[in-house]
Amino acid sequence: MHLNRTTMTRLQWTLTLALAGIATSVALTSSSSGVAQVQNANRTGELGSGTTCNLCHGGGSFGTSVDIVVLDPNSGQAITQYLPGEQYVLEVAVQTSQGTPPRYGMQATAVLDASSTNAGTFSEPSANTQLEDVGGRHIFEHNAASASNAFSVNWTAPLEGGDVTFYAAGLAAGNPTSAGGDEYAGATLTLPEVEVVIEIGGCTYDFACNYNAQAAFDDGSCEITSCAVEGDLDGDGNVN
């Protein structure tokens, strides 16, 4: 069979487009193992992430939202501020209000607001998650299309630095084998650093020899006689 040049060109374009489609499909499907792990990409929504999961995922309609909570591991209660150097549990949940998608995915990070650097460290991720680094940014993400919508990891707060913002991207995956039928949502949570106030004890009796106007409480150290004036009966420094 003889093919003219026009027919051959069309065949070449068809083959090129088909191969590109296969490559794209493979790339998107393989990201179910985590976009940081597969593509070295940050999709958390923080300033350095560039773009979101909407770049590849869409078409779904689940009323998707993302919840971020940081828990005290001892009480199990959500915290509203953190103590430097303490360990907490970061939980990310992908919620839906319309239907139940078969799979879920997520990616999250923690950033110091003042410096845009990593805020603390992650450790001991839950069974459906993994830890990655993208361009130096610590990433916590799903390790496979997850049947559970809940993801968790231990977070150790930075030793200092002020406010910390957690960024999380979540996916409700309508079709676990492709990027179609998915819906993305993002969320942030900002926690301030606990302001530690050190109270100074001292003598709060203003007639004492060692009176300390800066003392927050009396520590029983007041000394009256060492500076007493002869004839001063009430310790006010004057002869009565």
For each feature predicted by the language model, list its residue ranges.
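Sec-dependent, cleavable N-terminal signal peptides
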Residues: 1-37
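Short amphipathic alpha-helical segments with coiled-coil-like heptad repeat character
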Residues: 2, 161-169, 214-223
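Intrinsically disordered, low-complexity peptide-like regions
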Residues: 2, 38-40, 70, 180, ...
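Polar/charged alpha-helical tracts
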Residues: 5-6, 10, 73-77, 229, ...
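Intrinsic disorder/low-complexity segments
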Residues: 8, 19-24, 111, 158, ...
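Sequence context surrounding c-type heme c attachment/ligation sites in exported
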Residues: 25-198
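Primarily marks secretory-pathway-exposed extracellular/lumenal segments that are disulfide-
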Residues: 198-240
